[in-house]
Every structure is written in C-alpha cells, then in structure tokens.
C-alpha cells in the first residue's frame, strides 16, 4: 500500500539553535537535511515545502551556522543542519560547526532519517563519505540527493546516478540515491514520498516502544 504523502507546505519555523542543548525536547520524529555548504540544501527544503524563504539561501556558502528546526505537525519535524566542508571560514568556526553537527547526529534520538545532498557534478567528497559511513553504521535510512541535476542532460545525469549507486553499494540497502533539481522539480515528488514513509515508520516505532514499556511496567 502506498504511503500517503504529507502536506509539506504546512511547515512552520520552530527555532534556531547553536547546539542540541538549545533544541526542544528530544521526542517525536525528526528528518534532517545535511550537505556540503554549496550543495543546494536550502533550495531543496524551500522546494519541498513550497515556501520560497523557509530556509535562507545565500550566495556565500557556509552562512547556515545554526541547527534550524521546522515542524510539519505535532511530533513531525524537519531539521536544516549546518553545512559542512566549506574551506573559507575561520578554523575555530569550522570546528564549532563540526562539533554541533556531530553531537546532533550521534545523540538526537528523534532523528529517524537523513537527507544528504551533493552536487551531481562533484559527489562523494571525503566529508560526504564520512556522513554516509556514519549513517550506515547507525543503520539510519538515507536519501542521497544528487542536486543541480538540471546542469546535466538526461543521459549523463542517469549515468551519474548509476555510478554513485555502484560506488556506495557496500554501505547497505538503506541508502537511496536520486537525481534532484530545485529549478526543474526533478525528484521532488520522490523526496516527499520517501520522507512521508520515514515519518510513518518513525511514529510506528515510537508507538511500539511505548507499548513495550507499558507491558514491562
């Protein structure tokens, strides 16, 4: 049975936080967007939610320094994580972002899925592979979006998707690879369907855990 697609344009901003200690309670289901600072993360969030300015886009990569939290409905949240891998920021600031990102990924129990974005022309950089390997170790479902797919014609685009799928095949079946373009709406519906399924699965997992705790009591 097909999962009903959530209405992502009902999303609203909740808070921005420098680290997990400033986030709301760690309950419900969160799906986080992560990627290098020039991967088109903010544009993807804006396109998914049909909110032009939900996530701020900037011509200067590395401007997203905070964990930004948005809520679709009670218990279902989207998270815009700080961009990683941009060289032209002070080392102290870069280390602070890395610590904030690592803490969220390792300790946030409500994190149930991760969308990792990469420029289709330059995928699988070292920092991208670190994210994928960590996700595989945690057995977290991942949707790898190869962004700016409009920059390639259909043949090379499909070849690049196949090449990336083959390159990460050893990391496990929980990583889904798709072409994506905010400009041409390539892959937007598939993204919405996948995330809707993750929210449903996450909510079911929480319900099962609550049931188990009641039985044990």
From Swiss-Prot:
Residues annotated as binding Mg(2+): 42, 64
GO molecular function: GTP binding; metal ion binding
EngB-type G domain ranges (all copies): 27-201
Signal peptide: none
Statement: the UniProt record of this protein carries the keyword Magnesium: yes
Cofactor(s) named in the record: Mg(2+)
GO CC annotation: cytosol
Entry function: Necessary for normal cell division and for the maintenance of normal septation.
Record's protein name: Probable GTP-binding protein EngB
Species: Aeromonas salmonicida (strain A449)
